[in-house]
Design a protein with these regions (language model features):
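Beta-rich interaction/scaffold domains
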Residues: 15-18, 41, 211-275
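Extracellular fibronectin type III
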Residues: 19-36, 877-886
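Disordered, acidic Ser/Thr/Pro-rich linker "stalks" and the adjacent N-terminal cap
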Residues: 36-120, 132-139, 240-242
Length: 886
């Protein structure tokens, strides 16, 4: 129903008519219209201005020919509809030209665009496309095809994807920039949108080409506008400034990009006055991609910092603030995704939609990502998605606030660049201190509720987007509060710049090492090598590398809002941490001499159990996922780099209770299950943990760590290995395969029973006869040190305590047994106790007293005979003689 008044209420009744007649009126329904205000589109250099002086409705257009008109080029097109012959250019946003399809002819040969004839030949540089004012219609414009005829009626076709969506009065419209200006007497516009879209156009607006923007661009010798041409003089700059300050004589509007062009011209003036002045330029690493050949390891973040923060706002005209992205590349096929982050974001709301830019200049509206009553805004990030991985890609931004940014990518691990890296760190620390001293001046001293609506807030250390910094290495990015990073740098080292530089240098290397440990654990490689040992890198090596290639992305540690008391969380994009993050710039890597020995055992430390826990989540295997458990293997590894007790060592008492309980099913205690996953490593890994940093990344696959081999086995799992399996069965099969032993007894002790398929699979391996369910970190250390084996014919002695004798009646629920050996006491791990032929307990040796006392609590066996047996095990799990007690 057309021509209804705005903000009016109507009573609606309907009837239906068919070949049988017309029905009665329906019930009455009340419906109200809303006020629809069309967008205020640019009028600067507009050719077809609204007018009431002709039939068409706009100036300088003399004819429109539509596809389905009497004089059109087709009588049938079920997708095409238009309200009137002149709907596209009648100056009325309530009339529409509609195609019920995503393409009007820009991608395929539908040829639906209308031919619009001007009264003269015009040089056109851009086109405005007004969308339908109806809600619920998605246009998703991404490509425009322009067919035009010049003054000699020569037909030409051009395409463009330089499309900028703008918003005004609650409605969006598109401004389409042609790659080159065209001279047109007649023009035809076709569009393509993304899948699921419909192309509904209210108005087409044509704009004469204005050379001002290109004239300013042509001041420079390079696309990034860093070097002025030698022909630039002050008179040239003055003339451009005068033109920029001259409004369109008809509309009275200034150039729509006046503010941006003024900044560009101001930059040119500064460069003219001082040849050393320049704006910040960021060089992107084009090799950091998400389309990795190997496993992603859950690290999906390929974004790189542009060292800037953008904050959304709206001006007095209702126009949203934009940034301008200038991107140049040695490869014209380069494509870069631009996103905005929200500082102090929520786990599900921290990043904007992607805007893809090509080499050149792109305007992007700054989005509001969250609705919370805090300042909106955050870092602007970029990632290279297409083009050569060796391309020189550079980006410059305008409309942003620069923040301290330390980028040592492709440098931090190169020892020959240590001085260069430390110089960058020194400059960064100086910049960071100055920035934090001045940060309050970037904020007002008071704000109103109205100010907050337009995203103007007081400075708040925990929520203000400007209190942030980015630090980038080869394998990591820190996106953390600038105040906390400065605190971490200065703490205990106030006034000692060189010590602060060294602290940061070590901290960055510690992050690199943390990720390297993760890569070693996962058994991935960063470069192809001669894995098959035939003396050359061949197709077999390359195929193996592709299957086990380390991700090219980086681990991102990002300051986020924590929910429900969480200390941190993991996602594909980042590990979210809370505000207190100064410790993340204080790690110290394990340093090695020429023989691969640790030289700083007393000071080395990575980033602790919390980061290990979350990294474990990021990198965990879907086929071997034990929730909130298997991820902690990363914590165990980083906590035992020097073969210390793992952070879960104190849980072995519970492990021993489980493996001697004779119960089916895994323990409900996660630390017990974790130690079940840890024990094969303890049993079969003879290298010091840190050695995986060397053994797991070279071409020799035979000396790799247990976890590297196991993770590769999961990635290589065959259909035979997968059949009739689940998480537990695959664990039995693949861990047995990796160690070359049948481990069914070990897993059965932990409550996992092998099925028939698993039993058949592991039957090819010899049975593991040692009871590795009793091994702990200390036993592994003793084995590696060569002090695990007891002397031959070490004899166990066992007897009842408290005067109990064999065959006597015991009126107590507790039975105590004294245990000792006649020699090699310091090599005894512990004692296994049997009750009536079944294991009922395992106790570690008492390291203080000569005897170890085991207490068995006996329940519900009144008036029954109980027989005991005891066996001692050394640290290498060799048993002593058995002693019977009854």
């Amino acid at each position: 129903v057309n021509n209804l008044d705005d903000n009016a209420t109507y009573e609606v009744r309907v009837t239906a008519t068919n070949h049988l007649g017309t029905s009665e009126m329906s019930k009455s329904y009340i419906a109200s219209t809303t006020s629809v205000t069309p967008p205020s589109m640019q009028e600067y250099k507009l050719i077809n201005r609204p007018t009431s002086e002709n039939e068409i409705g706009t100036t300088h257009i003399v004819d429109v020919r539509n596809k389905k008109d009497e004089n059109g080029w087709a009588s049938q097109d079920d997708y095409l509809h238009y309200d009137s012959k002149y709907a596209l250019v009648d100056g009325d946003f309530t009339t529409e030209w509609k195609v019920d399809n995503w393409d009007t002819g820009a991608s395929y040969g539908a040829d639906r665009g209308s031919e619009i004839t001007f009264d003269d030949t015009y040089t056109i540089g851009s086109i405005g496309i007004g969308r339908t004012l109806q809600s619920g219609h998605y246009m998703g414009l991404y490509k425009v095809k322009v067919t035009y005829w010049d003054e000699n009626d020569n037909k030409n076709v051009v395409y463009t994807e330089s499309i900028n969506e703008k918003w005004s009065n609650g409605n969006s419209y598109y401004m389409v920039k042609l790659n080159e200006p065209i001279r047109a007497k007649k023009i035809k516009v076709d569009t393509s949108g993304y899948g699921g879209s419909t192309q509904i156009i209210s108005e087409l607006k044509f704009y004469e080409y204005d050379t001002l923007s290109d004239d300013i661009k042509n001041l420079y010798e390079d696309d990034l506008r860093l070097v002025l041409k030698k022909s630039v003089t002050q008179d040239v700059l003055n003339e451009l400034a005068k033109r920029l300050d001259t409004p369109d004589p008809i509309s009275g509007e200034y150039h729509p990009d006046k503010d941006v062009l003024k900044k560009e011209l101001d930059t040119a003036q500064k460069l003219f006055d001082d040849k050393e002045v320049s704006e910040k330029i960021t060089t992107l690493d084009a090799s950091i991609r998400t389309n990795n050949e190997g496993p992603s390891l859950g690290m999906g973040n390929s974004y790189q910092s542009l060292g800037s923060v953008a904050r959304p706002s709206v001006d007095d005209k209702g126009t949203s603030k934009q940034i301008v992205v200038y991107m140049g590349s040695s490869d014209p096929n380069t494509r870069v995704d631009i996103v905005f982050l929200q500082n102090y974001g929520l786990p599900g709301s921290y990043m904007s939609k992607v805007q893809t830019v090509s080499p050149g200049r792109t305007e992007i509206t700054i989005p509001s990502i969250i609705s919370a009553d805090v300042e909106k805004g955050g870092q602007v990030m970029a990632r290279v998605t297409q083009g050569s991985t060796t391309a020189n890609v550079q980006i410059r931004l305008s409309g942003v606030t620069e923040i301290p940014n330390l980028n040592v990518n492709n440098m931090i691990n190169d020892t020959t660049k240590e001085k260069e890296v430390k110089d960058k760190i020194r400059n960064y620390i100086s910049e960071l201190k100055t920035y934090m001293n001045d940060i309050n001046t970037l904020y007002p001293s008071e704000v109103s509720d109205k100010d907050k609506i337009n995203n103007v807030y007081l400075y708040d250390e925990q929520t203000s987007p400007l209190n942030t910094t980015d630090i980038e290495g080869d394998r990591f990015t820190l996106t953390l509060p600038a105040s906390e990073i400065l605190k971490g740098i200065e703490s205990g080292l106030e006034g000692n710049t060189e010590a602060q530089v060294n602290r940061v240098y070590d901290a960055l290397l510690a992050w690199e090492q943390e990720v390297k440990v993760g890569f070693a654990k996962k058994g991935v490689f960063e470069e192809v090598q001669d894995f098959n040992g035939n003396g050359e890198i061949d197709d077999e090596d390359r195929a193996y590398f592709r299957k086990h290639r380390a991700p090219l992305t980086r681990l991102n540690i990002k300051y986020q809002r924590m929910m429900m008391g969480a200390a941190a969380y993991a996602s594909n994009h980042h590990i979210g941490v809370g505000f207190s993050s100064s410790q993340y710039i204080q790690g110290v890597p394990y340093k090695f001499d020429e023989n691969g020995k640790v030289t700083n055992a007393d000071s080395a430390h990575l980033y602790g159990g919390l980061i290990g826990h979350e990294m474990g989540h990021v990198m965990d295997i879907g086929d071997r996922l034990y929730p909130e458990t298997s991820n902690n293997l990363m914590t165990a590894i980083t906590g035992t780099m020097l073969n210390e007790n793992s952070p879960y060592f104190d849980s072995f008492k519970k492990v021993y209770e489980k493996v001697t309980s004779n119960t089916i099913g895994l323990s409900t205690d996660r630390t017990v299950v974790l130690n079940m996953l840890w024990q094969p490593y303890l049993a079969y890994e003879d290298n010091i943990t840190y050695e995986m940093l060397f053994t797991d990344v070279d071409a020799d696959l035979t000396n790799d760590s247990y976890f590297a081999k196991l993770n590769r086995a999961y990635r290589e799992m065959s259909e035979e290995e997968r059949v009739n399996g689940d998480r537990d069965q695959w664990l039995i099969r693949l861990s047995s395969k990796v160690v070359g032993k049948n481990l069914t007894d070990f897993y059965e002790a932990h409550g996992i029973i092998a099925n028939e398929t698993t039993l058949a699979y592991v039957s090819k391996f010899p049975k593991e006869t040692k009871k590795i369910q009793y091994i702990n970190d200390e036993a592994r250390r003793q084995r590696i040190a060569g002090t695990a084996d007891m002397e031959e014919v070490t004899t166990l002695s066992a007897s009842f305590a408290n005067g109990i004798t064999t065959g006597s009646y015991v009126d107590s629920k507790e039975v105590k047994i004294n245990l000792s050996v006649d020699k090699s006491n310091d090599r005894i791990l512990g004692y296994e106790i049997y009750r009536n032929g079944e294991p009922c307990g395992f106790i570690e040796r008492d390291k203080v007293n000569s005897q170890t006392v085991y207490t068995d609590t006996v329940e519900n066996i009144n008036n029954r005979v109980v027989e005991y047996k005891a066996v001692a095990y050394d640290y290498n799990l060799n048993p002593t003689n058995e002693v019977q007690l009854g």
